[in-house]
């Protein structure tokens, strides 16, 4: 009896070892079951075993991974082989689709950091591009992303640690019979076979329609050392994502093995079928032809022709009235693009009564959208198309930057020779109205210090919180808006600049306002330090209640920075405060703000604080550093003697747009 029991235990152990070894080596699925995979996002397994990564939902992600990791020994030659069948089905017949899917090898199944759209549910805008990401993705991308150097429209690519492909090709397969490549439509909804083979040094990607055997020649072949990328344990699976354009993405079957010898074949006859695209063109029923009297036909024609002419004239007039400029590359920005018709109606036809300000190259109008939302619409003239694509992309990106002390930029509209920028309307206008115009009540010191803290917080977010960092480049009182509760909101993204982590800049405009420009600006270009300089001028502007340059004043008072510095030397710093403050202020706080303004306007950029430090000083969580009016760089710069509202241009590759989107409400 004991001998029989030992035999049973022995064979049971052998079977378990064999099963474990088979799972470690590979698997094959001719259809899927819920217990086989780890699934998240909108991915799901449909009845019949069809794995659906995405549906027609916008901006969504779906993942499906084999639950157990596979062991890879980076110290020795590693290999793997996979074969799967997928289908990317448009939501309806002939529709454009987005955004694509990828086969993924990753050290983790946690992709909570990943973005949809062009990031395919695997990467995000700040994905580390070093080898520490340990990610391999073979993408079937259906949308061209210019920033990623994508090929046109649908393409296949190899991604290592970031979404920019190291190798890519248009989808096709090699026909031995014809001796040439035959194109494949990835987004037709028809099943496509994909083979990915890695033999230790060469990564091959091969495609073919469902009815074609594996071609002898791969679509992509790339020498790569994956032992530098893979860790000891790696997960394998699929990721799919949608943008504003969507598609239903399916996996019908999947085979994987670390060894070519043990690779199991898919049984294509057993695979579930993917749904076909909907054809919403209903058939027109045939009706029996009826004979009409010739006189009746003639009468109908005489009546119909004038009506058609009138309708045609009305249609032509309305089309010309609401005509816009639209190009194919703008489709992805759809939610950020407003129709001219909607803006025309919101502003009652851009009537004079809706005009709330002028500045730069355009006028600002107040409008109300159908839902009751109040907007500000700035109409800018533009003739050249050069740089327009980059400018619109940056406007849309800046529209995604959210902070309680930034004026929300909602979107844009393009017409021939005209660009319209749409932002949220600020009911209390711009701060300069209250500082420099006697018809408006002057803000108290408590209101002023609160506004200064608001704008410091906004600028600190642009410099340190936004990704990539943004340089504002035109901080001044006329670009600070006040909402319904008199909170400070920083506007004027018309001149903002992005700064990438390497310090490279891409400009939406290349101008600045005299009196607010740091002395090094023309020599070295814009930087966070030049923004801090302008903020220092803004501190003095708000505290003293005057502009940085007043040509009608005596010489000793003409330049704000120099005047404040001289008064500090004469122990009369508080005399520079705005007389309209009266006695309702804290002397120590006013002196601190004035000194901080001088510190921010130091001639030496490296001696200026960053905006994080400025916030600490304003909230008095940290004392000002020890310096005096005689310290090097304090109060020494003399700006050019021109009108303070003048702007100058600095050479730049991008189109030029000046002044605030919201500048000058109520003037």
UniProtKB/Swiss-Prot annotation:
Binding site for ATP: 356-364, 378
Transmembrane segments: 295-315
Extracellular side: 22-294
Domain (Protein kinase) ranges: 350-625
Any one GO MF annotation of this record: carbohydrate binding
Protein's organism: Arabidopsis thaliana (Mouse-ear cress)
Signal sequence range: 1-21
Swiss-Prot/TrEMBL catalytic activity: L-seryl-[protein] + ATP = O-phospho-L-seryl-[protein] + ADP + H(+); L-threonyl-[protein] + ATP = O-phospho-L-threonyl-[protein] + ADP + H(+)
Main subcellular location: membrane
The protein's name in its UniProt record: Putative L-type lectin-domain containing receptor kinase I.4
Record Pfam families: Lectin_legB, Pkinase
Known glycosylation sites: 55, 110, 124, 128, 181, 204, 225
Residue segments, region Legume-lectin like: 24-257
UniProt-listed Enzyme Commission number(s): 2.7.11.1
Active-site residues per Swiss-Prot or TrEMBL entry: 474
A cellular component annotation (GO) from this entry: plasma membrane
InterPro entries reported for this sequence: ConA-like_dom_sf (IPR013320), Kinase-like_dom_sf (IPR011009), L-type_Lectin-RKs (IPR050528), Legume_lectin_dom (IPR001220), Prot_kinase_dom (IPR000719), Protein_kinase_ATP_BS (IPR017441), Ser/Thr_kinase_AS (IPR008271)
